[in-house]
Regions:
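A short, polar/charged loop-to-alpha-helix boundary motif
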Residues: 1-6, 122-140
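Short, P/G- and charge-enriched loop/turn segments at secondary-structure junctions
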Residues: 1-2, 11, 115
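Short solvent-exposed loop/turn micro-motifs enriched in small/polar/acidic residues
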Residues: 5-8, 98-100
Length: 164
């Protein structure tokens, strides 16, 4: 992604909508658990991840679709929050290379169960019903935000995780 776009500088935002408070992480953001946690801490009730992911031009035999779904499901379970992950389908043909996008958009409930999933080959609209009150209650009971050890996390701010 950094080869095609300039990184944003607005931080991670949460928006109030008529349905829920939503946090949106786009494309490459989806691979960083810190992004999901920040949006959840800011009050997001649903995480949205619009993306365009598929085969890697350098290794077109590698299918990362299961790994992609597991990463998003992990964000859902770790933050006890529903996730909506949308992905494009089809092939993008460039002058020198092409890239296949594998679809498989999905929705999870707040414990990481997939409640809706699209296929790889055709456009689909997914609908899923989630219970935001149950999600909030579970977060309060489990205390995953309350019990964090923030005094031990400063190493996350260093690229190599070093203590110095």
């Amino acid at each position: 992604e950094k080869f095609y776009f300039n990184p944003g500088d607005t931080g991670f935002k949460v928006w109030d909508t008529a349905y829920a408070k939503i946090g949106i992480g786009i494309c490459w953001d989806q691979w960083f658990p810190e992004v999901a946690r920040i949006m959840a801490l800011k009050g997001a009730e649903v995480l949205l991840y619009p993306t365009a992911i598929g085969g890697e031009p350098e290794d077109d035999g590698f299918d990362s679709s299961d790994m992609w779904q597991r990463a998003m499901i992990g964000h859902s379970a770790a933050n006890q929050i529903p996730v909506v992950a949308s992905n494009r389908i089809g092939t993008e043909q460039g002058e020198e290379i092409s890239n296949y996008f594998y679809g498989r958009s999905f929705i999870t409930n707040h414990v990481g169960d997939k409640i809706a999933e699209a296929g790889r080959e055709k456009e689909e609209v997914l609908i899923g019903k989630v219970n935001l009150d149950e999600a909030e209650n579970l977060r309060n009971v489990w205390g995953v935000f309350r019990d964090r050890r923030t005094d031990l996390y400063s190493d996350l701010l260093k690229l190599d995780g070093s203590e110095n």
